[in-house]
From Swiss-Prot:
It catalyses: cytidine(32) in tRNA + S-sulfanyl-L-cysteinyl-[cysteine desulfurase] + AH2 + ATP = 2-thiocytidine(32) in tRNA + L-cysteinyl-[cysteine desulfurase] + A + AMP + diphosphate + H(+). GO terms for cellular component: cytoplasm. Its main location: cytoplasm. Its EC number is 2.8.1.-. Keywords: 4Fe-4S, ATP-binding, Cytoplasm, Iron, Iron-sulfur, Magnesium, Metal-binding, Nucleotide-binding, RNA-binding, Transferase, tRNA processing, tRNA-binding. Gene3D superfamilies: HUPs. The lineage of its organism: Bacteria, Pseudomonadati, Pseudomonadota, Gammaproteobacteria, Pseudomonadales. This is tRNA-cytidine(32) 2-sulfurtransferase. Catalyzes the ATP-dependent 2-thiolation of cytidine in position 32 of tRNA, to form 2-thiocytidine (s(2)C32). The sulfur atoms are provided by the cysteine/cysteine desulfurase (IscS) system. The thiolation reaction likely consists of two steps: a first activation step by ATP to form an adenylated intermediate of the target base of tRNA, and a second nucleophilic substitution step of the sulfur (S) atom supplied by the hydrosulfide attached to the Fe-S cluster.
Length: 274
């Protein structure tokens, strides 16, 4: 890749800045961390690795990066692509070989979406491997749009107000998961992946289509952004500005314990009489 144009340079700086802000805001990476970067071969994980390698060079703390890919034995998976790329940029890496593809095909009827089960099997394997190599953080490539899509999926179909947190502790308590691209837009990531000419591996090798509900939500958000540019950013800010007293979850706010403050009236009268 040659010299960047002005716009390309702005794009690169924006992604690096936003990832750096997310890492700082949520204390994602600390001195001495061993960060296991989960690399699928898609645009998001390539971009995440690229940005984290930059942050590793300029950060005031020292941390280690190791890339990990899981070869799930999908037919046609190009086994040589990731090792070749990672060797070319000098990054330590591991390839986990585990045939979850056969398990998924056995459990899920033909024509049904396999993504959910496939994801759970992959996540469990990665958690175990992170523990084995002593990784203190496990980095996933989810971005701002993924987080918002998950929020609306849970809202529309699950009846819950939750999304993907930028940082979380796994259910088994053994792994801290981080999402350094939490502030980055999918549009920027797509443009950056093309600019950097990452060797993208198709995500549909298994023949499964993305969850239909997620596709609907993704298109809904894109249409909203087309109609009202900046709306996506505003919605994401809402996830960082929650007021439990203005919702209806009794576990988060003590509605039953609300009482009139008897001292409020005298204070109000005193203020008026001043």
């Amino acid at each position: 890749m040659g010299t960047l144009s002005v716009n390309q340079n702005k794009l690169q700086k924006r992604l690096r800045r936003l990832a750096g802000e997310a890492v700082t805001d949520f204390n994602m990476i600390e001195e001495g961390d061993k960060v296991m970067v989960c690399l699928s071969g898609g645009k998001d994980s390539y971009t995440m690795l690229d940005v984290l390698l930059y942050l590793q060079k300029v950060a005031p703390i020292g941390f280690e990066i190791v890339a990990v890919n899981m070869d799930q034995k999908q037919p046609g998976f190009p086994e040589e692509v990731l090792p070749t790329y990672l060797k070319s940029i000098g990054v330590d890496y591991h390839i986990i070989e585990k045939d979850t593809y056969s398990v998924v095909k056995e459990k899920i009827p033909e024509g049904k979406t396999t993504c959910s089960l496939c994801s759970r099997l992959r996540r469990g394997t990665l958690y175990t491997f992170a523990d084995r190599i002593g990784a203190t953080k496990m980095a996933l490539g989810h971005h701002r749009d993924d987080i918002l899509e998950t929020f609306f999926l849970n809202l529309f179909y699950g009846g819950t107000l939750k999304a993907m947190p930028p940082k979380l502790l796994s259910d088994d308590g053994r792994n801290v998961v981080i999402r350094p691209l939490a502030y980055c837009s999918e549009t920027d990531i797509e443009a950056y992946a093309k600019l950097k000419e990452f060797p993208i591996i198709p995500c549909n090798l298994c023949g499964s289509q993305e969850n239909l509900q997620r596709q609907v939500v993704k298109e809904m958000l894109r249409e909203w952004e087309r109609q009202s540019p900046g709306r996506t950013e505003i919605m994401f800010r809402a996830l960082q500005n929650v007021h439990p007293s203005q919702l209806a979850d009794r576990k988060l706010f003590d509605f039953a314990g609300l009482r009139i403050d008897d001292s409020a009236a005298p204070r109000f009268v005193d203020a008026v009489n001043l």
